[in-house]
């Protein structure tokens, strides 16, 4: 990964936090976004910028210049509607690389049909490590 890589991570639960911290430890410039201000506050010292916002609002994303990121990771785990809307917003804004978390095969199919090329499925990742 080039030193100047700029990543946006949406959804700072356990999974999103681990992704953000791993990227930051490799020298990436990491910007985190979550609708929960406590989560943003908890990670702010470990990333370049932590913002509390509603990622389903494309205007809010534009104010944060998300379209200038090299890649975005949507790690929202419990609200698939928010995942879909955030992914669509990022695709519409022209973010070059959009990586989205899914919770199973049905969600993968939906995300693929929307044009998402990189889909993470934590459960499958764990299963492949164990087997």
Residue positions per predicted region:
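Cytosolic regulatory regions of ion transport systems
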Residues: 1-131
